[in-house]
Amino acid sequence: MPVGSRQNRVQAVRKVSGSTDSTIPREAGIYPIRYTERKERKDVQTVENGTNEDSRASQSRGRRRRQPTSRTLRQTSQSRPEVLERNESGSDCKKGVHSHSSARKVEREGSRCASRGLHLSSTTRCTAXELDVAKQEEKEEEDNKEGYADEEQKIENSTQERKVVNTSMEDKATSHSTKGSFRLTNSDSNKELHKAIKVRGSLSKTDITEKAKFVNEVVEKEIISQVFKIDNRFTFDILHAGSYYERLKVGEADEFDIMVQLNAAKLSNIFQPRFCVARRHSRHLVGFAYLEYQSHFDGHKKWEDLLETGGPDSRPLLSPKLILEHFKELLSQRLHQINCVGKQPWRSYCEPSLHGPAVKLTFCLANDKTLDIDVVLCIQSQHWPPVANNWGVLNPLQWPGAQQVENIKKRGCHVVPKVNPRDQKCWRTSFSLAEKDLLSPKSIDEDKEHYKIVKVIFERHKASLEPLCSYHLKTLFLWLRSDGNWTEKRTQFKVIEYFIQQLLEKVRMKELPHFFIGHNLNLFSDLSDAQVTNITTCLKEIIKNK
């Protein structure tokens, strides 16, 4: 009769207890035969179900079934002997154990051991041979795991190698074959470009919104718009132009540009612009204009204190230097008025100063952040400069279209008080509103993102690239955009590389035509040989990314 039969178990219990009574205590785990058979059938079904579930799970993973380790056998044989003993006999489990998942796990382990020939004796203790077998299987399992790990690592390394090869092939396929060109590689070593891309999107929306609100509600409404209370000649229309409104702003939101259009009564009649033409003796004045005073329109002679003599045909002119100084003084007085009230929306401010054609205002806000604002005074001209009449006509552009060119010309232009070094009575022609019209449509947002990355790189090397400025970059961007296909079949890396290479070539040739005036005005004509050498050296280093 088998070792685990009911009769043998009864005899063993009677021998231990010294009893000959046919009644066996329930503590011995002996139940009536019918109940025992029912429990055996239930336990066998539970074990089979667990085994089938494990088998299906292991097959779905594509790996062989995990084998119990020596640690599992020691735990099941030493710490839970009563469970294995009663399971082997087909009797009930320890109270409170059979209803838990841990008991089911132990039963399944026992079934697996039995299926592999690892018989557990009636005393539920593993023999030395069984432990050796378990240890050997545990070692094999660890070896298999290491094998799987090594195989996965090989697959991952192979995948990375394929990615590197594909990237290298893509770079070779898209690289320029021009002799002497410098290639901006699309790799992790290109730290310059990756930093620029990161900085490009670093503008905090909360920060820029707070500062834009300060500019709109304080600077525009409380300062600039209230200047007329001090001098009623100075009434303004605010023109939202500049990098922020063109969505070309990069870096910190600590600088804003505001254009204010002088809008006095009959101003366009009182001052008539006289644009300089491209003549041999006055080529240096292309892009500038005189504002000639028409005295018969100024009945009260209100503007005589801002005039100077010595213009063409000996007519009085509106002086850019005098009006800029007067405008700065008006802003200073208005700041003092607000500061005296004691409810100023800033912690401190600096006295207004001249910064090119602008008056610079500097504020320290309540959060200790500094904000610089350049207020540019301008006067509108109803006429398009004759020197720019050929824009978009002689050489039709891919962009913008003919209709957009015509609409821009009808709106005229502006003049700002930036003097010419050779003639300080001139006003510089400004095409800011025309540039805003060209750069505002969302259809060119993708190209603008490329330009912003280049602009970030420029800001990082600004000192080494002097006297280049952001306006030179914008002009080149407009020219490249007008070609229509500068981004065609190029990745972002290649577009930026192409932009910098074009800038390098323009500097080397000392030639960058004004976008609207064309070759009549070369923005790089005043570059010295030393400046060209410094700029080209810096640009080569940027492209090489050393």
From Swiss-Prot:
Nucleotidyltransferase that catalyzes the formation of cyclic GMP-AMP (2',3'-cGAMP) from ATP and GTP and plays a key role in innate immunity. Directly binds some unknown ligand, activating the nucleotidyltransferase activity, leading to synthesis of 2',3'-cGAMP, a second messenger that binds to and activates Sting, thereby triggering the immune response via activation of the NF-kappa-B transcription factor. It is an enzyme of class 2 (transferase). Residues 1-116, 134-186 are annotated as: Disordered. Residues 1-10, 175-186 have a biased composition (Polar residues). Residues 35-45, 82-95, 145-174 have a biased composition (Basic and acidic residues). It catalyses: GTP + ATP = 2',3'-cGAMP + 2 diphosphate; GTP + ATP = pppGp(2'-5')A + diphosphate; pppGp(2'-5')A = 2',3'-cGAMP + diphosphate. Its EC number is 2.7.7.86. Pfam families: Mab-21 (PF03281), Mab-21_C (PF20266). Residues 69-80 have a biased composition (Low complexity). It comes from Exaiptasia diaphana (Tropical sea anemone). Coiled coil: none annotated. One of its GO terms (biological process) is innate immune response. Its cofactor is Mg(2+); Mn(2+). ATP binds at residues 243, 255-257, 432-435, 455, 470-474. Transmembrane segments: none annotated. This is Cyclic GMP-AMP synthase-like receptor. InterPro entries: Mab-21-like_nuc_Trfase, Mab-21_HhH/H2TH-like, MAB21L/cGLR.
